[in-house]
Amino acid sequence: MYDTTHRAGAPLTTVPPRGTSHGPGPRYRLVATDLDGTLLRGDATVSPRTLGALRRAKAAGAEHVIVTGRPARGCLPFFTALAYTGLAVCGQGAQIYDAGRGRLLCGTVLDRPAAQATLRRLTARVGQLDLAVVTSGEEAEFVVCDGFCRGDERELAPYRTADRARLWERPVDKVLLRHRTLSDNALTRAALECAEPGLTVVHAGPRIVELLPAGFDKATGLAQVARSLGLTAGDVIAFGDMPNDIPLLRWAGHAVAMANGHPDLKAVADEIAPANDDDGVAEVLERILDIGVLP
């Protein structure tokens, strides 16, 4: 994992704002949180303290919007645990899901020929890849090639196959890439260099590198939700932990990276919160609620 030297009770580390002051003046009306490595603890649960801080923020008049790389269907257990009924940005920004009504409002599909060409080029460069895909729509599932293993596959009713052609039997939202010897950073760089026009690559978590349609990210998805609520970037405080959160944190009025996060994300943050296992989101929300920076 990454730097986890920040522990509960230690002072928060702050870094200079990105050209604009984000002191106690602004009132943040939207709290945007990633799930894995941010709102969720390492055991994929939300702490009572974090639940309490989110309830306080809501009572103060702030909206909470989940912004995650997970497909909407993979978020359902967390919507239940959080009693979450608002709009959620899923699939790295390519899906908007109405949790209250249980409806996928919009989504996109990966360009299959472009994805296949990218994978051929990448395999020629780095050698064998272990692959999985997430199929499109509300009934999304993992289709997983032998050799690929992720702990959260069970949430999307995985179908495992030794035949890579079966990855493409249904429309696909994204491809998950894994290499047995390359680091995540090295695989991400190589995949970006090999990506066909119209595709992009994100490093979404430990051993999670994803091939996605270009033009969508967590910032574009959250901007769409914020507009529907009559809000702008300046109204938003955002929390994340991985490089796929960089667009989100750059867009938001105040950017908070978790202490357990990736160095590239910390470099663009206004503030470093305690780690996800140390109630980092809760600590920041409690502080800004106490000083009146939430409504």
Predicted regions and their residues:
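Short active-site oxyanion
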Residues: 61-65, 84-86, 174, 234-236, ...
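Active-site metal-binding loops of divalent metal-dependent hydrolases
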Residues: 35, 93, 240-242
